[in-house]
Amino acid sequence: MWEREKRFMISGDHILARITPNICLWDYDNDYLAIYLRNLRKVKTMQLGTLLTAHRQVITEVDARIDELIAHHARRLDEICGILEGGDATVWQLAHAMHWDFGTGEFAKFPPSQRWFALLEVFAHAAIFLQVVCLISTRHHWVVQ
């Protein structure tokens, strides 16, 4: 819900204050991460003063938070590209090699539900590389081109 005159929005899970929304790959026909990033940029043009999230936080520095989310995803993409420079890897292997700000930070120690979210996020980040021709998808691996 957006109140243009009051510069107010209820964002649901689209923009969260303390964590990043879990952007997943649900099919290969859509680039969900690119869509999400495009939508963040669109929200930034709305010049919001207050944003209510689905996790009970109020965000008053909306543009700054959007910039943080965009930067987070850029770092993730750089991290995956750096890992893949060492050779091909499955999404599972990528997830194990990545830095995580959850629990101990070790993917292997995540509870099953958190591993599931992490893997779907890695899939979404790896899939965006298909758009920039950094990776190709083989049957079992993402490979740097």
Please report, for each region that a protein language model flagged, where it lies by residue.
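C-terminal regulatory/interaction regions
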Residues: 82-145
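Metallo-beta-lactamase
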Residues: 1-77
